[in-house]
Swiss-Prot record:
InterPro entries: DBL_dom_sf (IPR035899), DH_dom (IPR000219)
Molecular function terms from GO: guanyl-nucleotide exchange factor activity
SMART domains: RhoGEF
Lineage per the UniProt record: Eukaryota, Fungi, Dikarya, Ascomycota, Saccharomycotina
Name assigned to this protein: Bud site selection protein 3
Length: 450
């Protein structure tokens, strides 16, 4: 299970505090309300960070060490199901933000908002993975406690912090409330700053030279939080009720893209989402070359991003922005409504096929965009009709894609995607089969179904 593997997101940016020659102090100083809100923001973030750090140091890590010393791999798997590595992921990114906020706290509200806007996008992937692990978490934790009360929870060498199940649940599950709390505090901070500036403009010659910076990083932070919480805005696209496609949870899938294939309107009682990736089409039919690959347990679906502003924004973005694939993964896996649709570019279904009709291979090539070597994927459709498409003018049997080397998936390999496609094929089976793994590490899996 990919959710039970530690998969921290690489960060290519880090906050650098201003030096004395370039630093410009905030235009509003010694304001009690603003200072109080800033202190609240720092205290809330510190409390969440220290709660997670202490739980890891005083319970989870000693427990893992104890289990690893026994040499029984199945025991570690069971431990990871109750204390998943996503706890480590959200602790890591909280520590990074905590360290940056400590460095910047003396510089005032402009730099604090800048830090939050720069680092909060890296919270998104860690938190959606963590939320996916928390389904029925309290039940799993209580069951684990009932079986290991004396050997683990009453063992002072393991439970150094003397944690109860209620405290553990509060820290692990309660961590998801951090982002909504951030939003409330950031909104109060932003409103307080704007209110004080308005007063200055009314009673003195006041030239505002920091609003553009504050607004940019504030909006970036709020967009991340809204995307995580599934905040619905007033920009929802109006969809013909006859064209809507619903999953069992009531999700309207035609919000994702236009030209949704009719054959995917059915089968949602057993269909699962295995993975979602953003790729670049090697031979696009138009300027729009970025596509979203959705790996279902029974189909592969390719969505083309057809919004020109998205390509411009992607090229010129100064800091990390939310990945379309991550937003969709959060919505489909964690059963959350789609966020404000301005976060999602316009998309349309390019093509689709049955999962068992495709052979996927990986090869190394040179990117025409970066001039560097990276992985490419080749999808070969072995059916007589090839890939299906809403605007099919000729048969297509092969599709080639470049795996984007970006801040979001710099270390993603083609073999990882192939492995997930093979796992999806296993999920799709409804009869007995044999599973073989090659001794050659270059070959991921071989399937022989009976």
């Amino acid at each position: 299970d990919p959710l039970l593997e530690y998969s921290x997101e690489a960060m290519e940016i880090s906050y650098t505090a201003p030096n004395s020659s370039t630093y410009e102090p905030p235009q509003i100083r010694n304001n009690q309300l603003i200072d109080t809100i800033l202190n609240e923001l720092l205290n809330v973030q510190t409390n969440y960070t220290m709660g997670l750090v202490n739980l890891l140091q005083n319970f989870i890590i000693p427990l893992r060490i104890q289990v690893l010393s026994t040499g029984i791999g199945s025991d570690m798997t069971r431990i990871n199901q109750v204390f998943p590595p996503t706890i480590d992921e959200i602790t890591r990114i909280n520590c990074i933000l905590h360290d940056s906020l400590n460095k910047v706290s003396r510089y005032g509200y402009v730099e604090i908002i800048r830090v939050v806007g720069m680092i909060l996008p890296y919270f998104y992937k860690a938190f959606i993975r963590h939320e996916a692990n928390l389904k029925l978490y309290t039940t799993r934790l209580n069951k684990f406690y009932s079986k290991n009360s004396k050997t683990i929870f009453s063992n002072n060498l393991i439970n150094k912090g003397n944690y109860s199940t209620r405290e553990i649940d509060s820290i692990v599950s309660g961590s998801l409330l951090e982002l909504p709390k951030f939003k409330l505090i950031l909104k109060r901070l932003h409103d307080a700053i704007e209110s004080e500036k308005l007063k200055k403009k009314n009673f003195e010659n006041f030239v505002d030279n920091e609003t553009s910076i504050i607004t940019y990083y504030y909006n970036t932070a709020i967009e991340v939080i809204d995307a995580f919480g599934g905040c619905q805005g007033s920009e929802d696209r109006k969809i013909d009720s006859q064209l809507r496609v619903f999953t069992p949870t009531g999700k309207i899938l035609t919000e994702l893209a236009t030209k949704w294939p009719p054959e995917l309107q059915y089968g949602w009682l057993s269909r699962k989402v295995v993975g979602i990736y953003e790729l670049r089409n090697v031979k696009p039919k138009s300027f729009f070359d970025l596509e979203i690959l959705i790996i279902f347990s029974d189909h592969l679906l390719f969505l083309t991003i057809i919004e020109e502003s998205y390509y411009i924004r992607k090229k010129n973005e100064p800091i990390k922005s939310l990945s379309v694939s991550d937003i969709l993964m959060h919505s489909l896996v964690n059963e959350k409504p789609l966020p404000v649709l301005s976060l999602l570019p316009s998309m349309e279904v390019n093509s689709w096929c049955n999962l068992n009709e495709v052979i996927t291979s990986c090869y190394l090539g040179v990117s025409s965009h970066t001039s560097s070597k990276q992985d490419f994927l080749r999808f070969l459709n072995v059916s007589k009709s090839g890939f299906k498409s809403x605007x099919l003018d000729h048969l297509i049997f092969t599709k080639n894609y470049e795996i984007l080397r970006s801040k979001e998936n710099k270390y993603l390999s083609g073999h990882k995607i192939i492995e997930l496609i093979n796992k999806a094929k296993v999920l799709y089976k409804n009869q007995l089969f044999h599973l073989f793994r090659s001794t050659d590490s270059k070959i991921t899996y071989l399937l022989n179904c009976s």
